Amino acid sequence: MEIQFDEPKKSLRPKKVNKFKGRNKKSETRDKFVGVRQRPSGRYVAEIKDTTQNIRMWLGTFETAEEAARAYDEAATLLRGSKTRTNFVTHVSYDSPLASRIRHLLNNRKKGTKQQDMNGISSTTSHADTTNDTTSDGSTSSTTNCIGTASGAINSTSASGVTSTSTNISTSASGVASTSTDISTNSSNTNVNDKSESLLSSSTTMQKPNLFEDAYRPDMSNLTNEYESSSYKSNVSWDFGPIFDNFPFDQWLDMTNNDGLLCDMVDKGVSEFERMKVERQISASLYAINGVQEYMKNVQDCNEAQWNLSPLC
């Protein structure tokens, strides 16, 4: 058997024909002439730019592209010289109305740039002057302030030195015065103390003989006899003879026996001070007698031993 393979039929596609678009008139004119552009209305405009002087100048509107290109060539040669790129080989006539207009525009442009430059320079100079003035004013004020503060410090230091010296002098003077017053007060105190001591010593020396002279001496013979009898009973030997001689028992007994005399003395106008003095002396003598009796009782109660006491002077 024969096997037959059917080959698929190839579909024939039509070849694409590349259609090249022709150049547009606008693009042709734009690429053909330098410095020329066409408006939507169909007219042509010529303008020039100068990057060195930052100038963009509108040269005018023309009906054809060639006229606009020639205007550009004249402006370019006037601005940049004869070696610049132009659309045509042209000879520039300096008396043409385009050349005069270009000169007028260039002069105005140069004046404007100069004016701007002058304004910028004046503004910078004025700003610099103001800054200099402010700095100079600040420096002068600071210098004057420094001078003022320095002078003030000198004056204050001098014044403080004067005041300190004056205060030191015053304090030293006050110290001398205080020392002198202390010395005087000490001397006066010592004088007063000496005087008081002398007065006290004289008063004591004057009072001692008066006390001994005015002391009463009562008669203690009965007491001595009773004491001797009691001492014999207790087998204790006592010797108080000289002691009782020192006490003014005789005068005390005389005063006790003479109470009427005391009343008479009071009636006669004896001063109250003397009466108090006499009463004090009587109380002192009674205290001495009571002390002796208590001492004797204590001695008798202590021991039965014999005591040999030396006479008290």
UniProtKB/Swiss-Prot annotation:
Q: Where is this region: Disordered?
A: 1-29, 108-143, 157-204
Biased composition range(s): Basic and acidic residues: 1-10
Q: In which tissues is it expressed?
A: Expressed in roots, root hairs and leaves. Expressed in root epidermis and root hairs.
UniProt DNA-binding region: 32-89
Which biological process annotations from GO are given for this protein?
A: nodulation; positive regulation of DNA-templated transcription
PROSITE patterns linked = AP2_ERF
Q: Name one GO cellular component term.
A: nucleus
Which residue stretches does the UniProt record annotate as biased composition, category Basic residues? Answer: 11-24
Q: Which key words tag this protein in UniProt?
A: DNA-binding, Nodulation, Nucleus, Transcription, Transcription regulation
Query: Which GO terms label this protein's molecular function in UniProt?
Result: DNA-binding transcription factor activity; sequence-specific DNA binding
* Stated induction or repression of this protein's expression: Induced by Nod factors in root hairs.
Which purpose does this protein serve, as stated in its record? Transcription factor involved in symbiotic nodule signaling in response to rhizobial Nod factors (NFs). Binds to the GCC box (NF-responsive box) of ENOD11 promoter. Acts as a transcriptional activator of NF-responsive box-containing target gene promoters in root hairs. Involved in early stages of root nodule development. Functions redundantly with ERN1. Is essential with ERN1 for the initiation of root hair infection, and nodule organogenesis and development. Required for accurate expression of the NF signaling genes ENOD11 and ENOD12.
Protein name as it appears in the record:
Ethylene-responsive transcription factor ERN2
Q: Which organism is it from?
A: Medicago truncatula
Taxonomic lineage is: Eukaryota, Viridiplantae, Streptophyta, Embryophyta, Tracheophyta
